Each structure stands twice: as structure tokens, then as C-alpha cells.
Amino acid sequence: MSVIRLQGETEKWKGLYYQLDSGDEPIGVGGMGQVFKGTCVNEHTGATRPVAIKFMFDDLPPHAIERARREASIQLRNDNLVEMLGFIEIAERTQYGDVKMHYHVVSELLTGVSLSDLMEGKTTDRDGVGVPFAEKLLADYQNDSEHFARTVVMNILSGLMALHDAGYIHRDIDPSNIMITQDGHIKLIDFGIAKQMNTLTTNDKGLTVAGKFLGKPEYAAPELVLGDIRHQNQTTDIYAMGILLYQCIVGHTPFEGPRHEILEQQLKTKLPLSAVHN
């Protein structure tokens, strides 16, 4: 079994490289690529740390590559945020003399369970190993939902404040983008459609090229639904946090149904807050 070594220009300057075994199976697959477990190696000290390396699919459109590059650039250290480590571009010369680019996104390796899975009763990681903190949180969710909600929301708000202080908005907060880790943290992940507020343009409405809304409709603030970039700011994320708080207490989101109906309700219907007090 051979070892794959990845090192971009930034990594060369820092004296770092990433490696993984070529025969390893992916630990995750998404719409943009496959994720593998790898190792970050310091060339000077020999120190290592486990990392997650996303091998992006070939032939992705330029806007998808740029989105991944932007995600990898949000490199903040906070107990409640996933740590992004780098974006690596590798140029390969084909047998025909052409240059083919390969792109990789590197982040810290998280093991645990997503909040969405936890709320469905799952407390084991991808290897089937129990996550003690998740087991405690599940007991709270089942027996004291308000305490559960406070724990989750206060932790995510801590990470979100760091993100906002750095000038970014997340724009895709929902339970599938929150991880309960083996080492006892609650982390906000997936900065795929996050954006610096001072660089928002008409190309950053939160829509795909075809005009399809990118985020989760159940958690989308009206300005996201409308693609109104003028009013996308920290309160866009706070709206999603309010929906998350509601869900943690009540057990479901305020608006349910077909996607188009949920988007319409976000624009026209007041949140049914009476359910929180029942």
C-alpha cells in the first residue's frame, strides 16, 4: 500500500505536509468530494496530528472550487468551531501534455455524532463507538429539553460569536452542521456557504447558479429565502439559532412540509411560539 503525500505552497513555507494511505476507504462522501482520514506531519519536529482531507471531485464548476477555497480560508481556533487547516492545489501533467488540477480541503478530524443524529437517538460515532457526552445530552433531550437546549445553544453561540467577530456569517446553521465530539465539545461545522460580510456581492445571494436556495429552508431567515444580500448579516445566523432553540425544546422545527411551503411560511407566518410553553 502506497502513501499519498500532499503539500501545497503554503505547506512548504510552513514546513508541513499531509499524508494518507492510498488504499484507505473514505470516511464520508458529499456533493463536492470524498473525505479521508489523514495525518498532518511537521517536517521540522516530526509532530503529527490526525486530519480530515476532502478530495474534491474532478470537473466541478469554478464557483464550487471557489466556495471550497473560501471555506478553507476561515481558519479560526475556537472550541466550538471546526478548525480549517488548508486548501491544497496540485497540478498534474497528463500524458497529453495538459495540466489537470486537483483540489483538497483539510480540516481537523472530528469524531462523534451530529446533533441531528443525536436528536434521532443515535449516540455512537461512525465506527460504532459510544460518545459519552452525546449519551448525556440525549438523556437531557429526553428528560429536560430546556437544559439540553441551553447547553447546545450556548456552546454554538460561543463559536458563532467568534465567527462573527472575524467578520463572517455562517448562513447554514442546522443540526446536521453541529457535531458532538468524542472529546466533549459541541462544534459548528461546514463553512461551505459562509461569507465575509464586507465582501457580500450580488453573486452571494445564497443561491446556486440555477437560482436554487442553498441552505436548509427550515432554518432560513427571510433575507436568505429572498436572496436579499443587503440584509444578510449576523442576525441571519441569529434567526437560525432561534429556530434551533425552538427545535431543541419542542422536538421539531416550527415549519414543516414540502420545501416550497416551508420557504413561503418563513416569509409570511409568525413563529408558533406558544408551542415552547406547552
Where are these regions (language model features)?
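Protein kinase catalytic-loop region centered on the HRD/HxD motif
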Residues: S158-Y168
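Protein kinase glycine-rich loop
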Residues: G23-G30, V35
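Conserved activation segment of eukaryotic-like protein kinases, specifically the C-terminal portion
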Residues: L207-L224
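Conserved short submotifs of the Hanks-type protein kinase catalytic core
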Residues: G97-S114, L118
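Short beta-strand micro-motifs within the conserved protein kinase catalytic domain, predominantly
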Residues: E83-M101
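Activation segment signature within eukaryotic-like protein kinase domains
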Residues: V152-V153
